[in-house]
């Protein structure tokens, strides 16, 4: 059984993330979507809220499970004996950062490999930050995130969606 880990903050999960997860689930026997507790980032949503949104968004993909971690990704990989990291690339600018991360992970855990999946063209502009900014002003985020996530965003910002 070949497993892969797809790490991220998922603050919140977007349809771009889900696209990468669905495609990864067709390649690997199991995908572990790993919510990072990154001390350098101040998330909008709590860990519990992010896990809840992922559970709702990924419930129809049978070979996906969700977990969370704090610390080095490679320590988590060793602990569960997984050697594959999936990362999505939206643009060339993503590659430079992701390549550096992949090399660092390889240095710390020589057995691990990072597999890059190129985003679907319709999601190349999409990021959690973009979605949060649009939602904070009540802008329409339909098609950018699952409906459940959109509800949670508008609720968090205390706004009603415009033009939906």
Curated annotation (Swiss-Prot):
Binding site for ATP: 9-10, 17, 88-90, 98, 123-129
Compartment list: Cytoplasm
Residues annotated as site: Transition state stabilizer: 17
EC number(s) from the headed UniProt entry: 2.7.7.3
GO molecular function: ATP binding; pantetheine-phosphate adenylyltransferase activity
Residues that, per the record, bind substrate: 9, 41, 73, 87
Single GO cellular component term: cytoplasm
The reaction(s) this protein catalyses: (R)-4'-phosphopantetheine + ATP + H(+) = 3'-dephospho-CoA + diphosphate
Top-level taxon of the source organism: Bacteria
Keywords: ATP-binding, Coenzyme A biosynthesis, Cytoplasm, Magnesium, Nucleotide-binding, Nucleotidyltransferase, Transferase
GO BP terms: coenzyme A biosynthetic process
InterPro entries according to UniProt: Cyt_trans-like, PPAT, Rossmann-like_a/b/a_fold
Reported function: Reversibly transfers an adenylyl group from ATP to 4'-phosphopantetheine, yielding dephospho-CoA (dPCoA) and pyrophosphate.
Subunit description: Homohexamer.
Homology family: Belongs to the bacterial CoaD family.
Annotated PANTHER family: PHOSPHOPANTETHEINE ADENYLYLTRANSFERASE
Name of protein: Phosphopantetheine adenylyltransferase
């Amino acid at each position: 059984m070949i497993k892969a880990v797809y790490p991220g903050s998922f603050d919140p999960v977007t349809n771009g993330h889900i696209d990468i997860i669905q495609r990864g689930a067709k390649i690997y026997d199991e995908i572990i979507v790993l919510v990072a507790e990154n001390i350098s980032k101040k998330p909008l949503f709590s860990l519990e809220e992010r896990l809840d949104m992922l559970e709702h968004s990924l419930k129809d993909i049978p070979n996906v499970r969700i977990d969370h971690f704090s610390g080095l990704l490679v320590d988590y990989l060793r602990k569960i004996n997984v050697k594959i990291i999936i990362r999505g690339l939206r643009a060339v600018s993503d590659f430079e950062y992701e390549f550096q991360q992949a090399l660092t992970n390889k240095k710390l855990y020589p057995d691990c490999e990072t597999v890059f999946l190129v985003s679907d063209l319709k999601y190349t502009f999409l990021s959690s930050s973009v979605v949060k900014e649009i939602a904070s002003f009540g802008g329409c985020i339909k098609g950018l995130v699952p409906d459940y996530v959109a509800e949670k965003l508008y609720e968090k910002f205390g706004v009603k969606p415009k033009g939906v």
